[in-house]
Swiss-Prot record:
Protein name: Ferrochelatase
NCBIfam families: hemH (TIGR00109)
InterPro entries, sorted: Ferrochelatase, Ferrochelatase_AS, Ferrochelatase_C, Ferrochelatase_N
UniProt keyword annotations, A-Z: Cytoplasm, Heme biosynthesis, Iron, Lyase, Metal-binding, Porphyrin biosynthesis
Entry's family note: Belongs to the ferrochelatase family.
Organism: Salmonella arizonae (strain ATCC BAA-731 / CDC346-86 / RSK2980)
Localisation: Cytoplasm
Reported function: Catalyzes the ferrous insertion into protoporphyrin IX.
Domain of life: Bacteria
Amino acids binding Fe cation: H194, E275
């Protein structure tokens, strides 16, 4: 009997190819055209997207990307490649491909790369610790579209999420402890997750619960009293209500109340990106300090740390 050959597909959101208005516009157009991300009826959404959002946001967002761009590209791409290489180094007989929902390398190019390596089973690991229809669901949808065009369909193992996985929680806890050792233990640890529209949760997306699961397990692992930890949601977009409390408003309130020392971690981001390095580490830091806060530190994402690679090994092990 022929032995199954397995490959691993690491999936993430994506990034512009360059910190220019043109590249950002291409990326945002693809991202904001996905019904999993914005489900506004298309006759209403297309004119708004093409006539208002893309022309206005692309130059502004490009400037933000310029402030965090690295020699090897956007931080998300640099760290994602390091994750791919780190996992591949630990699994020399298992092909590991990287694919993005938007931009390049695409999910289709990752599937093609694995099929070219003659795999007949693919383990798909979306690097979103907490399931949401707008992230993990988008990977699932695109994977279905890709495979619908193939004559040869491999076996698929799809890891839905890992919000309360022990190796993931241990990696987060180690990162937090290292930050506490470097900056001192904070008055408050703020756990900021990417937001989604409240309506998505009302319609059945269990993302808020999965965020609560991560928070509960991390607080337990750190041994912190509940009053020293807060959970908030960032990066809201548009006018409809999103999950609350909002990170920026909470930081302003905490600064005004006289909270002295805050450290912020973003457990939902597997790799540092615009939303962590610019929005959290810079914009929200200014909000807190200008409101009266004294000390603010951002705890980096897990990126390609050995603990993060260990977690990927453990998550994929049952399917290899």
């Amino acid at each position: 009997m022929r032995q199954t050959k397995t490959g691993i597909l690491l999936a993430n959101l994506g990034t512009p190819d360059a910190p220019t208005p043109e590249a950002v516009k291409r990326y945002l157009k693809q991202f904001l055209s996905d019904r999993r991300v914005v489900d506004t009826p298309r006759p209403l959404w297309w004119p708004l997207l093409r006539g208002v959002i893309l022309p206005l946001r692309s130059p502004r967002v490009a400037k933000l990307y310029q402030s965090i761009w690295m020699d090897g590209g956007s931080p998300l791409m640099v760290y994602s490649r390091e994750q791919q290489q780190g996992l591949a180094a630990r699994l020399p007989d298992t092909p590991v491909a990287l694919g993005m929902s938007y931009g390049s390398p695409s999910l289709e190019s990752a599937v093609d790369e694995l099929l070219a390596s003659d795999v007949d089973h693919i383990v798909v690991l979306p690097l979103y610790p907490q399931y949401s229809c707008s992230t993990v669901g988008a990977v699932w949808d695109e994977l279905g579209r890709i495979l619908a065009r193939k004559r040869r369909i491999p076996g698929i193992s799809f890891i839905r999420d890992y919000a309360d996985d022990g190796a993931y929680i241990d990696a987060l806890a180690k990162s937090a402890r290292e930050s506490f050792a470097r900056h001192g233990e904070p008055d408050l640890l703020l756990l900021s997750y990417h937001g989604i529209p409240q309506r998505y949760a009302d319609e059945g997306d269990d993302y808020p619960q999965r965020c609560r699961d991560t928070t509960r397990e991390l607080v337990s692992a750190l041994g912190l009293p509940p009053e020293k930890v807060m959970m908030t949601f960032q990066s809201r977009f548009g006018r409809e209500p999103w999950l609350t409390p909002y990170t920026d408003e909470t930081l302003k309130m905490l600064g005004e109340k006289g909270t002295g020392h805050i450290q912020v971690m973003c457990p939902g981001f597997a790799a540092d990106c615009l939303e962590t390095l610019e929005e959290i580490a810079e914009q929200n830091r200014e909000i807190f300090l200008e409101a009266g806060g004294k000390k603010y530190a951002y705890i980096p994402a897990l990126n390609a740390t050995p603990e993060h690679i260990d977690m990927m090994l453990k998550l994929t092990a049952p399917y290899r």
